Amino acid sequence: MNPAPSQTPPVPAGLLPRLGAVFYDSLLLLAVWFCATAILLPFTHGEALRAGNPLYTSYLFMVSFFFYGWFWVHGGQTLGLRAWRLRVQRPDGRPITWWQALLRFLTAMVSWAALGLGFWWILFDKRKRGWHDLYSETETVRVSRDYLRSVP
């Protein structure tokens, strides 16, 4: 008899599925940025916003955090993570907190700024954790198809 999906220890997610999820999420995030920018247009009287504007950059940064944070805190899966059958969680399997989401997001930004070194770290860590996993005390695991069917 096979153990129930919740009793099976989670398998850490490797680098390639994570990068696949990042690619999917980046396409969705781009669409979210377009909508977030459109919301600002009435306040600029229809004028284009400059990409280097620090307020605009900060605004998009916050939009990005809330995009990822919402999905991570509420179910542990962005659409990209769901498509690749991955989930972000605490080591005990519970959903992450907003504080962990913030730490994870900020550390992931540092990882990207360091030419992805924090993500390449996954290849050398025994539990396949990147800098963002380590610093936020979270993990990214593979989930079964049964788990995906049970989540609305």
Locations of the language-model features?
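Glycine-rich flap/beta-hairpin and adjacent strands of clan AA aspartyl proteases
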Residues: 117-127
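Short, small/hydrophobic-residue-rich motifs at membrane-helix boundaries and re-entrant hairpins
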Residues: 1-113, 130, 134-152
